[in-house]
Amino acid sequence: MSLHRILARVLGRKETPIAPLPEAEERDYSLSELSGYDGSDPSRPLLVGIRGYVYDVTRGRDFYGPGGPYGMFAGKDCTRALAKVSFDEALFTGDLEGLDADELEKLEEWIEMFEGKYPRIGRLLHSL
């Protein structure tokens, strides 16, 4: 039993139910479809595209949701922006052309982080 439940019983308060996070459908997404998962609709999951894959970052809503430090990445292919460690919206693309070895290494570090933290739920169709 969680500490919250114990305290709720002892203090005679009802637990406040926690709303479940919206679940993302496991499938392939077009860039246009991905844009609908940017956090503007709280009933929908938050999705991010990176190097041809789509990740469900809903559990990181504080980071990837509206107003979060990485909120601008939600609903977009942020491959190039992550490689360049940039928030420049002009870099929200899957284009790897011209990236140097350091940028490609940085991108791999980001991908490793996403793979370890968020479920990969599909592919980004424009990158196939």
Question: Where would I find each of the regions flagged by the language model?
Answer:
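Histidine-anchored, small-residue-rich loop motif
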Residues: 2-128
